[in-house]
Amino acid sequence: MSKELDTVEVSIRVPFGKSKRLSTTASRRARVQSIMYFLAFNAASKYYTNYELLHNGVEVDEQQLISELAGNEQTVHLQLRLKPYNTGEVIRHFVTFREYIGFVGDSDDDITSLALSNVAKFRELPLTDIAAASGKTEVADDRQKEEFQVSDAEKAVFTKELDSILELRPSAQDVLKGGSALSKPCLRSLIISGYNPVPAFFRTKGHLLYLQAVTLEGETLHITATVSGFYVNKSSAIKFDPTLKTDAAVCLTLYELLTKHSKKFASHLSQLEAALKAHESVNYVKPISVFLHKTWFPSSLPSNSIDFTEYQLEALNFQTERNFNDEFQAVKETSSEDIVARLEKEKLLNRVIHDFNVAASKGSMEIFYGNMVAMNPDAPRQEHIFLKNNIFYSFVSDLDGHYQDKGGDAAAHAASNQDLHIIKTLLQSNMRSVRHLLTAVVEFGGVRILAQSPVPGILDTAGMKFIKNEKGEEEAIQAKNDITVCYGFDEASNKVIADAEFGSSLDDFAKVFHLKKHEVDGVELKVASTSKGVVGFDKRNYILDLADNNPLDVGFALENFDAVTDEKARYPHRQTLLRRELVEKWWFSKVDGTGSEMEAAYEEGKFSYNPDAYKIEGIEDETVVELSDYLRKEVVPTLVKEVAEGSITAPFNGEHLVDIMHKNGINIRYLGRVIELAEQELEAQRALREAHLQQVEADNKEFTEWEANYLKHIESLIKERQVTIQKLLAEGKEVPAELKEELKLDDKEIRKPHEKEGVAVNNDQLSVLLTLAQIEIISRSIKHVFRKHCHELPAVIIPTFIAFALNLLFGYCYNKAPIAEFPTDGSDIDFAFTKLTREQLLSEISEQAVLRFRYTLPDGWESRYEHTPFALLRPICNKFGIQLLNKEYFFTREQYQNWRQAQDKKIRSKLVEPVSTFSINDLSVRPIIKVATLTTGVSDDCWAQGAYMINEEEKQATALALFSQSIAFREETSGYVHPTVAESYLALSTIHSKLEKKSEAVALCRKACAIYERVCGFDSFEMIRSLNNLAMLEMANDSPYNAALCLKTIMSILSVVIPVNHPATINSYSMLHSMCSSLQNSSAMIKVLNKLGDIIVEIDGHKSLPYAVNESRLANLYASVGEYKRSLACIESCYELFSKELGVNHKTTVECNSWITGVENLIESTSQSKALAASKAAAAAKQGEKKPAQKQQQSAELRDKSIDELMNFINGGSAPAKKSKKKKNAKK
């Protein structure tokens, strides 16, 4: 790799700037394009967009390798020569310039016109600068290691932040409010002028385009773009004169022109560049291969200024109609012999795939809004097909009856998702023998569209064919297309076909998906019979209809579809396939279980299955049954068990639960089963605890009896000794030494305290799992109900239905009889949904829960979310594509009145009481876009090499360099803002942390947080997970204030997304307690533990082992600050609980009992000391003497003690031990 990454110096002579020269370094194996990227981001050259690079006077191509220019030299000398503009270059310059001067905001991406994104706000978190590496050394004593090395100022701000956390009462509106935009335009507007197109007369004078700018001073500039540059012309709003304005000059760039005509432009641009420079670029750069997260709770409506640039640019688009399939397949065929070639290939693939996804999304929305003409306009709407920009669109439904016996449209819906999942796998496989189509699934208002790049030639007509009919007359008919099915099921002939030549191209496909050869209708196949193999006009082999290459979940299908005769109770479809992750998990387990070699098992096709088994009558395969049983009997129960035990982190929200299930290969239809198993686990744990408590009670009773008998036994021994001694004395004999010594007891008879573990119920883990699984079931059931009612509605009426339905669900306590609110233009159509009642809606939701998840919702389930409506609103909005405006919503009249009274009197008189909780003006509907994306193999390989080396100390530096290079590769191919980039930063931060590189770990984790917020959302589980990591890293890096800020954010988000206490909240308070301890702030520790105790009570109740443990920690703290009575109350509470939970003869209980005696003695001693001190003070006052107060000194010493020292002191130890003695005692 080192040879490939050798660098050279690049010196570029430019016609601008003071030095007239720019320098950079570049890899020899990079292309000239990388130098052009440098020029595009360099401050001195970025405003020049139209140039060519010369080497030795000859123009170089951007795809040329730098090594070809450098030869054996270490420096490459290039010249930048400006070119005359043409219209296309002027438009490119105009678009690029708009981006540079703030017209493209932080929340803008390629589909901003379809949905809103919030401005990210993680960068606004008032985190202090990353602390430098700590100066702690290994020889520091234990206490120094535990203490933070922070200033008094940071201690103060931490304490203040802690107090705000303890009083935290966040609202969804505050938590999810977006940030402030970093990028703000430096002009009021910059648009293409209405005087375009350029008249023919002026076109011959070199005019290319007319622009119009309004400066911040309010001056309107009409600009002419010519082949030589830009100048301000004489036009006005009412007069067209594109000639050069008096005293104006031609400028090479718009930047140069506007700087001359607007002082505020220059100053605001400097401020913008300074603001951007102050932040990592991931906070504001536009993503190039993914979409930004489209929030369910946008902070504001889009602030549209007069700017119709997007429409104008589409009209002025000089590109020919793109053929995405040709581009995609051509790039896949390019060589990838070295790293540079592979990177270039992956970069181009990412760009083509993303451009297709953007075009497919926008095209689908044109269809939903009725702006695209169908190819078959006379057919019913569901049968309409569309073709635009070489993308084929069709509504997802069972048009040809293929799924008639499997559930019809419901099965077709499921198959479209399954098809996309197969394509995701194919994208990663880099398979070239057989091709797939670019695919996107776009859903809007419950209607789903499948967008695909068509097989070349499949939509072309073969012209007309003339034949003679029965009467002998010539008749024209459509000639058959040459593109026909040559492998798989051919609907035209109703036969299964297997062309041998095409079949040979499917070997790699069969290996990737672990498919075995099988026969269907006497024809041997390598893939599912429903898949279709065709050869396009481009002579490439294509495989279509991929879904059925995943095996059937036969156990589920037999039980919930085949065996159910009542269609209303039957699962909606039989397209219940197993996920790819499950198949891979099973396959790896089989390879490991049999001791097979991984590569050999793959190449030989071991552990493969028949994809047609149980889908076609008479075709069976035990492997498919094994796969289904593996999911149902092993994977699902194991997952529930692991969550219950805490070996898997409790999911942060519904999306996290779904992600955990999917990564384990579990389909969402098993949510009901997850709840069933979790409830069983909870009952089992409760039963185990109850049995344990009964056993402890019996043991306590038995021990008490033994103790009483043993005491009697000792008393009898003492009496016997006394009788013997008296007898000896009476006889005048000497008493033997053994009778003078302490009574010797038989150790075998003494019952020493035991240390058996108590039994606690994992309520925190299981309650979260149960709650989130139920929320997912409810929200998904609501999605299906909404989909049913919206299916035939016009797009503009969908918000009316949504507002009405949400009022029925959530606004019932505010308005029990909401009325559907239509747009201002009104509607003469009587829509059926307007007659829907709350009872009917709740009934439909419950029916869907039973139908799709085999789960019966508990009676009154809706009332559970009356106090936490946003916990359910959020997943509903995310799943159906609803965007609710971030504002105050009133779910009861009382809420509204309280809010109204809190407003200023002047405002209060103008307020209009809302008719219902939700209005159509509060929401919009966005498309749900499902796409397949590519991950970079070059980056993965580089990371794998680093992972192989990282555990070898002498290779750690190389490993870290490889990790960084991997991220750089990923950024180059996917862009700086991408989920996989964030994942890499998060993983690398963990690695740095383990290597004690704490500052670097914090920086990397902050970067991950910034990216995750933009692509996944502020309330996403990825963001919460990253913040949790960041909190731990900041804490380890001696930055308690920063850690507290992160924990506060986590708790705020969790309060919105989940209606029960999450283990992460408990963990957050535990971390705060630990930080307070390191800061030696006992009073703060007490506050945190009291808060933690309240949470434990909510989860486990007062009579629980966790509560007892927390109380014991409080007792220690109260004792350390001299509040002995409070300490005693806590200890007595602990003793009672430990006695019941652990037993009276448990070591902890015994220590607790002795502790009670010690504290009681301490209280009595303190009381006596006070009385003695008071009498001495009175006597001293008479004599005019003053002596230091012994108690104050003792209390101060006690406060400085550790918990172990306190225990020793309370249990009978003398004066406070010195630090040197602490270690000695600890060793004992």
Curated annotation (Swiss-Prot):
Coiled-coil residue windows: 671-702
Presence of the UniProt keyword Cytoplasm in the record: yes
Cellular compartment(s): Cytoplasm
Gene Ontology cellular-component annotations: cytoplasm
Keyword DNA repair: no
UniProt xrefs under PROSITE patterns: CLU
Residues of the Clu domain: 298-557
Positions of TPR repeats: 486-519, 982-1015, 1108-1141
Single GO biological process annotation from the record: mitochondrion organization
A GO molecular-function descriptor: mRNA binding
Keywords: Coiled coil, Cytoplasm, Repeat, TPR repeat
A Pfam family annotated for this UniProt entry: CLU_N
Subunit structure: May associate with the eukaryotic translation initiation factor 3 (eIF-3) complex.
Function statement: mRNA-binding protein involved in proper cytoplasmic distribution of mitochondria.
PANTHER family, per database record: CLUSTERED MITOCHONDRIA PROTEIN HOMOLOG, EUKARYOTIC TRANSLATION INITIATION FACTOR 3 SUBUNIT EIF-3
The family this protein is said to belong to: Belongs to the CLU family.
Protein's name in the database: Clustered mitochondria protein homolog
Source organism of the structure: Eremothecium gossypii (strain ATCC 10895 / CBS 109.51 / FGSC 9923 / NRRL Y-1056) (Yeast)
Gene name linked to the record: CLU1
